[in-house]
Amino acid sequence: MMIIEEYTPVPNTAFDFKIPDLIEMQLSSFRIFLKKGLIEELKDFSVISNSKKNLELRFFPEKYKLKRPKYNERTSIRRASTYTCQLYVPAKLTNKRTGEIQEQDVFLGEIPLMTGRGSFIINGSSRVIVNQIVRSPGIYYKREIDKKGRKTHSATIISNRGAWLRIETDKNGLIWARIGKIRKVSIMIVFKAMGLTKNEIFDALKYPQFLKKTIQETDPYLENDIQHDDDFENESTSTLLSTREILESRFFQSKYYDLGKVGRYKINKKLQLNIPENIRVLTVQDILAAVDYLINLEFNIGTLDDIDHLKNRRVRSVGELIQNQVRVGLGRLERMIYKRMGESSPDSLTLTSLVNPKPLVGAIREFFGSSQLSQFMDQTNPLSEITHKRRLSCLGPGGLSRERAGLAVRDIHPSHYGRICPIETPEGPNAGLIGSLATHSRVNEYGFLESPFYITKNRKVIKSELPIYLAPDQEDQFKVAPGDLLLSCYSSIENNYVPVRYKQEFTTSKAEEVDYVGISPTQAISIATSLIPFLEHDDANRALMGSNMQRQAVPLLKPNRPIVGTGFEEQVALDSGTVVICRHKGIVISVDSKTILVRSLRMNAKGIQHSHIDRYYLQKYNRSNQDTCINQKPVVSQGEWVQKGDILADGSATVNGELTLGQNILVAYMPWEGYNFEDAILISEKLVYEDIYTSIHIEKYEVDARKTKLGPEKITREIPNVNDHLLRNLDDNGIVIPGARVESGDILVGKVTPKEDLDQHPEGKLLRAIFGEKARDVRDSSLRVPNGVSGTVVNVRRLTGKELPSGVIMMVHVSISQKRKIQVGDKMAGRHGNKGIISKILPRQDMPYLQDGTPVDMVLNPLGVPSRMNVGQVFECLLGLAGEYLSENYKLMPFDEMYGKETSRGLVYSKLYEARQKTGYPWLFNIQSPGKSKLFDGRTGESFDQPVTIGKAYMLKLVHLVDDKIHARSTGPYSLVTQQPLGGRAKHGGQRLGEMEVWALEGFGAAYTLQELLTIKSDDMKGRNDALNAIIKGRPIPKPGTPESFKVLIRELQSLCLDIGVYKVHKSNKNQEIDLMQNF
């Protein structure tokens, strides 16, 4: 277990409340699935009999076994396999006719195992199952008002599995039931179908007179025993019977209908019933109580439901999602077993022939491979990993679709406080549909989000007791104050009136009336947002961008701790699993780059101490899903004593166990020759030469040799018509040597493929059969380094034999490592949503410099601050400057204004003044312009007219690197139908010239440019070949011909039976038809 740093959320805390483990939600959900969920599903499927009832298959789910995985996590990643364990369940097959019994452990399939970091390894890649937030099963009441002001009410009973039941009143005061999507029937028919008498119905209702209209409408067909019209009688009887059948099959049978534990709990709570939790189907009592509540609403008694309130939305975590998939797989298996029992003779059947693991394996593989909720893990940095595991999505099966989701669903709701972060969500179509768990939030047994609060009595916040976790529906009944209240040294509330939340309203209340207080100022926000210092001074839109962009920061070669942090950096590094934690106290006996050995004393079962050596393996230059480098470095030395929970090794984006995503650099907010116009950034060449923003990226390439119709492909060094220079890095087998430096176009793996010789004569075939293959009969299909890529080969892996899919003889994986320095076109950002693209790299002697001669590292546009309202960056850079000169690092809890107005400004100014006193530099804090200083132009040595804001800002280099985006094409592939160049960098495509661009050229009258773009640069096949020849031979470019797309248009019109042709106009009025396909 990891030891979590104790954290004091409010000053003068008597009881220190720890931040919960940030990935506990994933781990506990999977644990519950293995302990309970899997057994539940196997129980529902435990007995299967054939149609004659003479053969019975029984499973014993409580005794199921999981076999130890064949390969561990590291080996699974290396072999590109899935980290799974085999599921065996004891089964008994009884032949009741002969009395024969077969018993054995049956193999049902493989279940992927969760790693200790909350992810799964599927085909060698880390994947995460995202938590889904959906409408909770239960009953919901809604009111609708038409244009004339008439009210109608409806009740919808939502199940966990099965049809929905809707009961509604109409504008005439009639009550109807709607089952699923079929036509609606009168509620009286439903009551009669359930066998209720009038007296039973009336006794259950508070206002039975409201039913009179419905009875008058329905009773002529139900009540009159003496009917004169046989047709009516038949119709009413058939309606009654069909309604009874539908109710019986859809709502009263557990095989087809399941309210779930949550649905039963919600219905019991809403309708004040005491039906046992194990009855998960609808009962007569439920429907009567639902109708009673609906009628009460007509008399303004009762409450309507807000579907966006978190009490009506629950979280489906990884365990539940896999359990649902296991149910699907077991359902398929059940049908297969039933079919086999019917088809085969009972005497010939065995357990192994009857139970096939394929249905369950297929269902689980389908979920992990293609479900919307199973996602490729974001491994850009430790923060992106942890945030991905804490994500909440409204999308996916059983959820919303982004097209249908309105504003109400996406909006922030008062019940989100302390549960879902109001800041962190994507920009674009998914805004509000994908959220992130708040720092202290947890999921209760029913799947509802809870948040912790301290109990408050008579203004005193009781911190000596553990906080109480409140669910959203419980919190509505109390007056709850936020976590950033100012408390006295005795933990009592200082102010007489405080802001509170009460019954969904944000209001003010007397301090004596407060029931609960939040445990921390950061309780309402997510982990990523709580890493932003001075968050309270940023506009929410920019804080959102800051939260999202921290997840895109690339781990750097020389990471640096932020001077100004928030205190959450250590927590994120610990819980992400990127640092190596000591499991037992002991002494370090050996340290190298790959392994750390720790000798510890342990107590065995008999109470005797014995020496034990713990071995810790470090990850070295492994590739992440986003091609960033995963590397661990030891931070302990031989002979050092370590305690349980100490950090033994740092990850690629941590320093001494603290998250480090960027660098502290000296910035100046000033314009510079227009190079920082519109968010462009000007940087010093120091950042390039000193590798301050250099990062390592590892790309993986693979090639396989297959069996073909003409013979097997071969991995070899003998490649026809290839320059020896391209083969310089290959070994004798034609595979690149690890450590080799490779450039674009170099061969990584030499491969030849047999090719068909179309002109081969029979005698030639005979000669080939006698003398064997010749070199000319194969074509070069080697794996080459793609355009724009160069680097060092760090890993080469050959796969042969059983590891490969059918038809593949050999597979080779090659990993190339690149060192990428910062360059023009790369994207950078701060933690406050202040992002930009590097526009120019200046020599350090040309950069503006401070009064002590220090050149600044980066020049930012000051106009980027006022309109964006992210003033937090200014506070951060000024405090960072003070910290640099005072050699101090700061951990600042967001929302410090609880200590008084202008607290942040006071802290920054006091630290700048302290730095001035310590260093003797009066310009560090000038009373006339605090935070600003005179700067000098590096080119001329003259001072700038106005004082400039300077400071140390923590800037990140983002994963949007120009090397991955820049693209140019001269010639390349064309589309088969239109003969126009393909689009996109991956296909080596061209630039799209859309209709708006055509309009622009037309507007300027650039006729020849336009003609050239639409013909020889696009789809005039003959014209572009002629133009290429003319360029090579230095001749004038000939006139363009007809674009291929025009020919396609004519062919399409002709295929619609329209006689369309192209004619050459003559003066003699004898027009000649031209075959475009032949002549032009």
Swiss-Prot record:
Record-linked HAMAP family: RNApol_bact_RpoB
Taxonomy, superkingdom: Eukaryota
GO BP terms in the entry: DNA-templated transcription
UniProt-annotated location(s): Plastid, Chloroplast
One GO molecular-function entry: DNA-directed RNA polymerase activity
Gene Ontology cellular-component terms listed: chloroplast; DNA-directed RNA polymerase complex; mitochondrion
EC assignment: 2.7.7.6
UniProt function note: DNA-dependent RNA polymerase catalyzes the transcription of DNA into RNA using the four ribonucleoside triphosphates as substrates.
Stored InterPro entries: DNA-dir_RNA_pol_bsu_ext_1_sf, DNA-dir_RNA_pol_bsu_external_1, DNA-dir_RNA_pol_su2, DNA-dir_RNAP_su2_dom, DNA-dir_RNAP_su2_hyb_sf, RNA_pol_bsu_bac, RNA_pol_bsu_CS, RNA_pol_bsu_protrusion
Family the UniProt entry places it in: Belongs to the RNA polymerase beta chain family.
Quaternary assembly: In plastids the minimal PEP RNA polymerase catalytic core is composed of four subunits: alpha, beta, beta', and beta''. When a (nuclear-encoded) sigma factor is associated with the core the holoenzyme is formed, which can initiate transcription.
Organism: Mesostigma viride
Reactions accelerated catalytically: RNA(n) + a ribonucleoside 5'-triphosphate = RNA(n+1) + diphosphate
Protein name as catalogued: DNA-directed RNA polymerase subunit beta
Key words of the record: Chloroplast, DNA-directed RNA polymerase, Nucleotidyltransferase, Plastid, Transcription, Transferase
This protein's encoding gene: rpoB
Main subcellular location of this protein, as a coarse class: plastid
Any matching Pfam family: RNA_pol_Rpb2_1
